UniProtKB/Swiss-Prot annotation:
Main location per the UniProt record: cytoplasm
InterPro entries given in the database record: PPIase_dom_sf, PPIase_FKBP_dom, Trig_fac, Trigger_fac_C, Trigger_fac_C_sf, Trigger_fac_ribosome-bd_bac, Trigger_fac_ribosome-bd_sf, Trigger_fact/SurA_dom_sf
Name this polypeptide is given: Trigger factor
Species assigned in the record: Clostridium novyi (strain NT)
Family, similarity comment: Belongs to the FKBP-type PPIase family. Tig subfamily.
Gene name as annotated: tig
Catalytic activity from the UniProt record: [protein]-peptidylproline (omega=180) = [protein]-peptidylproline (omega=0)
PANTHER family: TRIGGER FACTOR CHAPERONE AND PEPTIDYL-PROLYL CIS/TRANS ISOMERASE, TRIGGER FACTOR-LIKE PROTEIN TIG, CHLOROPLASTIC
Amino acid sequence: MNTKIERVENNVVKLEITVEKEKFNEAIKKAYKKNVKRFNVPGFRKGKAPMNIITRYYGEGVFYEDAINTCCEEAYPMAVEEHNLQPVDYPKIDIVEIGSGKDFVFTAEVVTRPEVKLENYKGVEAKKNTYEVTDEDVEKQLNAMLEKNARIITKEEGAAVQKNDIAIIDFKGFVDGKAFEGGEATDYSLEIGTGTFIDNFEDQLVGLKVGEEKEVNVNFPEQYGREELNGKPAKFEVKIKEIKVKELPALDDEFAKEVSEFDTVDALKADLKTKLEEANKNREKVEYEEAVIEEVCNRAEVEIPEVMIEKEIDMMLKDLEMRLGYQGLDLASYYQYTNSSEAKVREYMKETAEKKVKTELVLEKIVKDEKIEATEEEIKERAKEMAQQYGGGQDADKLVEAIVGAQREVLARQLANEKAIDFLVENSKEIA
């Protein structure tokens, strides 16, 4: 096999690969054996005709497709390895020469991983944000705990709807005098003042009593997300079925004992403050790492192939689809609710995808230049963490082995990138 390489443009190369005629003839014979049973030739039982008879009857190229596939699948990876290329997409194959008794010559045009030009990535300056825990922060946590443990009780007979009440309602909506999809519900639980419903819908229920009905008039936002409703005035027929109210528990030592391991409210507050401080430290660390990485990436020069960005967007869409699935939705529903489309979402994701790809390439460059590697022990430790998340149980060791076997390269790359980030942070300078 002979190969030639031509650089078409940045990150695109064309390989011309010559497969010797002997190899190509072997591939044709292999294709004959694979397909002979498909051919009917007069004078021969089906599947028994010799190769030369079949080619005479059906034409010289009858076995070329399979032979080409065989040769390309064998020769292309060898050429890639010979020229030390890192393809990021499937090659575009074109036939240059093919025929009986001839060498098989083809070209493979392929997009390769781009070269990153990066200098002076040590000692970058980045802003370090700091966050203090205030008494208000602790109070918010306590209030959330009180809300979570609140009792929902029915208000006394004759009481009217007030802000923060929970109104159980039936409603039916109309736009242009016609009921619309999703505009009707029975026994809907609506907390007044949360802004769950559009416009001033909730405010118009204040003062109503059980059994009373009201016509509520609102306007849908211009960007509501449904073309047939955007900016339209709407009328809702609403009936109050029941009025409930949250009864918060007393914030005392008994409450602290019920919801935590602590005997007093003061001890509970101290614990909440400690946890908030830990969360803030982690936030500061993550934000500083991101600031350092962003500064390093700004110093890097790299021309990212469009296909790498598109593949990253594909992954982001799959992640979105998975998260929507947890909510019982799919992408089609998401596009409808957000008045969008796949093309619009892909365009919206493009900037983030490009940033993620560039970060990956920059970290890869630093890993290579600094000779950073993940040890076997680190890979196994990460696999153990994953096994625990999967709930390995008694077969944890086997699960760890399976994870290492299937994802060794991925884990090694993740760990090396994490070490590269640590390296950049350790060699950076904090600025206020």
